[in-house]
C-alpha cells in the first residue's frame, strides 16, 4: 500500500508494479505516457501530467488526444519502464438526452411525435431519457471495461537501454483505444 496524492489529500491504495516493462514511452508538452497492449489488440493508455500540471490542463490542451489517435508519435522512445499503477474502479453515467436535443434529435422524446412503428405497432411509444453508463476497472487480473474483459499481452523487439520510472501516484488520465479510436477516456483522481 502506497500513497496516492489526490486533489483532496493523500490516500492509501494498492499499486500494481511491473518492473523493466519494455514499451514505448511517449511525451508531450505537459505529460508523459505509456500504453499496454490488451489481448484483443486494444491499448490501455496511461497519461500522467507533468509536475505543475493537472489532468484538466492536459485534457484542455488536447495534445494527448493527437498522440492517442496517431500510429506514430514524434516524441516516442522504446524504453524499459518501471510501471506502477494503482488499482482503480471508475464509473460514470451520462445523460445523453440533452446532447441529442442540442443536435436536433427531439421527436423521439415527444409523445405523439416519436415514430417507433417498426418496433411496435400495438402502442405508440417514446423515449423519456437516454443515458450511457460506463465502468472501467483495473486490477491484477486485467482490465474490465463495460461488458468485456481483456488481459495485457506482450511482445518485444530488441531490449531498450534506458530505464524510467512511471509512477501513477497522482491524478492521471487513462484511455482504451482500438485501431486508434478511443473507446473509453477517463481520469483517476481518487483510486
List the model feature ranges, each with a label.
Residues 1-191:
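Hydrophobic-core positions in well-structured secondary-structure elements of globular domains
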Amino acid at each position: 500500500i502506497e500513497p496516492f496524492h489526490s486533489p483532496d489529500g493523500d490516500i492509501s491504495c494498492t499499486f500494481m508494479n511491473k518492473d523493466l516493462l519494455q514499451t514505448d514511452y511517449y511525451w508531450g508538452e505537459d505529460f508523459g505516457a505509456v500504453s499496454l497492449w490488451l489481448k484483443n489488440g486494444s491499448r490501455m493508455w496511461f497519461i500522467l501530467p507533468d509536475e505543475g500540471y493537472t489532468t484538466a490542463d492536459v485534457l484542455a490542451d488536447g495534445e494527448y488526444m493527437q498522440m492517442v489517435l496517431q500510429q506514430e508519435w514524434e516524441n516516442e522512445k522504446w524504453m524499459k519502464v518501471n510501471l506502477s499503477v494503482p488499482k482503480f474502479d471508475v464509473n460514470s453515467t451520462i445523460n445523453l438526452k440533452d446532447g441529442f436535443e442540442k443536435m436536433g434529435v427531439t421527436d423521439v422524446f415527444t409523445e405523439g411525435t416519436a415514430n417507433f412503428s417498426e418496433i411496435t405497432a400495438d402502442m405508440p411509444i417514446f423515449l423519456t431519457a437516454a443515458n450511457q453508463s460506463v465502468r472501467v476497472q483495473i486490477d491484477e487480473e486485467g482490465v474490465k471495461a463495460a461488458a468485456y474483459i481483456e488481459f495485457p499481452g506482450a511482445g518485444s523487439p530488441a531490449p531498450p537501454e534506458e530505464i524510467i520510472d512511471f509512477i501513477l501516484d497522482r491524478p492521471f488520465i487513462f484511455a482504451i483505444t482500438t485501431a486508434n479510436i478511443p473507446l473509453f477516456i477517463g481520469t483517476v483522481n481518487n483510486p
